[in-house]
Each structure stands twice: as C-alpha cells, then as structure tokens.
C-alpha cells in the first residue's frame, strides 16, 4: 500500500483510464467520498468526475463549490429517470459522458462516476466501471449490511460511512463489521467518517492497488 504511485504520464501510456463507479443510497455520502478522493488524489493523478442526478446537476454544483476539481473537470448528467438504469441497463448516457470527458482530457488517469441515489440492488455495468465502490451509512441502522443486495455483496469495496453516528442511532459497529464479513466473504470493506477524513486513505489505497496505479 505504501509503494509509490505511477506518474500520470507513465500510466497513461501503459493503460487506459481507470473508471471508478461510486454508488449507494441517497444521503449515504457518495458525493462527500468523491470530493475527498479528488482532493486526496488530484496532486498525483489526472482526474475527471461525472455525477448523476435525476432532474438536476446538484452534485456537480456541490463538488465545484467544494473545489474538488476545476469546474471543467466535473460533468453533471441528468438521467431523467431511475438512477440504476443509467448505470446498468442502459448506461449509454454515462458512456457518452465518459467519452466527452476523455476527449477533453485525453491524459486522464481516473474517471470517477457517481451514480444517483438508489437502493441496495443498484450495480454498475462492467462496460461503464472497472471498479465499483458502494457506500452505505450507519444512520440507516446496523441491520443494513445483512439486508444484502448486489451493492453490499458484489461491489469491489464497501464503504460503511458515518461511524460517528453509531452512538446516536444505537448501532453497534462490531455487529455491522461481523455481518459485513458474512455477506461479503473475502471482499474488502472500510468503515469511515468522511467528514473527519477517517478511512479516506484506506479507500485511496484500495483504488491504487486494485486499479494498478502502484508499482
């Protein structure tokens, strides 16, 4: 995990851009995670980001205001319908957005794609995403991991966010961790408090390792 990262130029010549899909229910912390990842990785990698909302471009605006990346490197997509359709059954609107961003920034190392808020059944099309990160939050209760669904059981990385709220909602983090291991087997997970940056480095390390960004 501590190996030096490839420079953007070296990776661009060797491999196509890594596409990282970030999904999860409304309010779980997807946009916050994307913001923190951009801020943590933008000095080492050439990044672009695509956000999905049903009728607005609110997440694009939030990332721009937060200074996650320069405005021109963040594209908002209005899906106009069910969020999971735009990332799975008919991902054409997002595939087109990826192509447009890469035509503007052909040296990009990573394309982040944030889905609109959806249920536990949402997954990314393999045509759209090389790695998938699924975000749930403690505020939903400690039962969430054992509810299952493809996002929890099949994502490359599960992020359990808002650990600081556990005492307030009566959630037992040890129970959540145990249930997560039962549901995911050997697939990794990270517990985070993104507002305090807790766990962000672990997510970055996962992306670098699984995305072949380290040597």
Swiss-Prot record:
InterPro entries: CobW/HypB/UreG_nucleotide-bd (IPR003495), P-loop_NTPase (IPR027417), UreG (IPR004400). This is Urease accessory protein UreG. PANTHER family: UREASE ACCESSORY PROTEIN G. It holds the Pfam family cobW. GO terms for biological process: urea catabolic process. The keyword Chaperone applies. HAMAP family: UreG. It is found in: Cytoplasm. It comes from Burkholderia ambifaria (strain ATCC BAA-244 / DSM 16087 / CCUG 44356 / LMG 19182 / AMMD) (Burkholderia cepacia (strain AMMD)). GTP binds at residues 24-31. GO terms for molecular function: GTP binding; GTPase activity; nickel cation binding. Coiled coil: none annotated. Keywords: Chaperone, Cytoplasm, GTP-binding, Nickel insertion, Nucleotide-binding. Facilitates the functional incorporation of the urease nickel metallocenter. This process requires GTP hydrolysis, probably effectuated by UreG. Belongs to the SIMIBI class G3E GTPase family. UreG subfamily. Homodimer. UreD, UreF and UreG form a complex that acts as a GTP-hydrolysis-dependent molecular chaperone, activating the urease apoprotein by helping to assemble the nickel containing metallocenter of UreC. The UreE protein probably delivers the nickel. One of its GO terms (cellular component) is cytoplasm.
